[in-house]
């Protein structure tokens, strides 16, 4: 179980929810980073008292240094300062909740220090998954996914020592706010429409990506990288209720699923505590009050981003080799 964490991307949706979980679990915070939100990072730093606070925007970092001048918190600015937060010696776990490829270098730096990586930055695996997974193998670092779908799969794979036992991974997808529309109707939707996700509370970029199913396409590639399986063993189903977070089908016909409320603090909590569990003050899933659970095929004509991501995954597979060992 984690005891001290660094959070890269602390002022975003995942970062803020991670701090909620850290407070509930009594975890110490060693470092906090953000892009440019000096006001919010100041408030977080004053509450959690990290050793280090970083803003990648250097002008904002100067502002933060003035704001925190009455504390003993060290303030750094610039993109390279992310690396210092990632390798902060007090932290045993690094939560990578930044957006985009900016997460790659600090993730690799944390891996080299044998940190547990609570990975919420899917772009790191999409753009350099083989590099990251090979580095984790080399340095003996643990990567625990924070995405709800990949956390579900991670949990359903506990006890599976041989990937040949897996028939397929099944990623669930809510379908977003445009589910059931025609391509013509989707084409008339606005940014505001895309930001109205029916089930999840997330940051704006991932919410828009969910509306187009681009996020699900990235998650397909992420699953291939993280679990080292070909595209033929990763499928997507529409599950409007967002109760079943993903499933694993085994070669003997058994299907394991992880269920829970649509609350990102659940996978964040598991990434902090696994392989153990901790009490959760949030309202649990009430099976008797659940709506009927439905599953359907996604429409790749209405949502071509999913198809394009799968085509990109096929192209990547032709240029890359999967590990020959069946062990993880």
Predicted features along the sequence, with ranges:
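Catalytic, metal-anchored helix/loop core of enzyme active sites in primary metabolism
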Residues: 1-328
């Amino acid at each position: 179980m984690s005891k001290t964490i660094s959070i890269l991307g602390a002022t975003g949706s995942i970062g803020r929810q991670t701090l909620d979980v850290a407070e509930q679990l009594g975890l110490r915070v060693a470092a906090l980073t953000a892009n440019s939100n000096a006001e919010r990072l100041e408030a977080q730093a004053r509450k959690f008292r990290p050793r280090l606070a970083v803003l990648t925007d250097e002008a904002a970092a100067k502002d933060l240094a003035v704001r925190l001048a009455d504390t003993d918190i060290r303030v750094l600015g610039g993109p390279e300062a992310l690396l210092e937060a990632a390798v902060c010696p007090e932290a045993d776990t690094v939560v990578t909740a930044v957006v985009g490829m900016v997460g790659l270098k600090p993730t690799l730096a944390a891996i080299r220090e044998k940190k547990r990586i609570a990975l919420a930055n899917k772009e790191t695996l999409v753009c350099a998954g083989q590099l990251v997974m090979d580095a984790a193998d080399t340095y003996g670092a643990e990567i625990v996914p924070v995405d709800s779908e990949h956390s579900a799969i991670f949990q359903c794979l506990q006890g599976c020592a041989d990937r040949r036992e897996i028939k397929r991974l099944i990623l669930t997808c809510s379908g977003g706010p445009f589910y059931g529309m025609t391509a013509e109707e989707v084409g008339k939707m606005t940014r505001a429409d895309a930001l109205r996700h029916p089930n999840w509370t997330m940051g704006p970029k991932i919410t828009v990506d969910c509306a187009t199913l681009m996020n699900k396409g990235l998650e397909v590639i992420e699953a291939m990288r993280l679990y080292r399986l070909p595209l033929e063993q990763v499928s997507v189903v529409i599950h409007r209720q967002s109760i079943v977070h993903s499933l694993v089908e085994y070669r003997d016909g058994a299907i394991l699923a992880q269920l829970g409320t649509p609350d990102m603090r659940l996978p964040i909590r598991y990434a902090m505590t696994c392989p153990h569990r901790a009490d959760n003050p949030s309202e649990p899933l009430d099976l008797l009050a659940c709506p009927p659970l439905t599953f359907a095929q996604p429409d790749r004509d209405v949502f071509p981003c999913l198809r394009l991501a799968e085509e990109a995954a096929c192209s990547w597979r032709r240029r890359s080799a999967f590990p020959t060992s069946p062990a993880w």
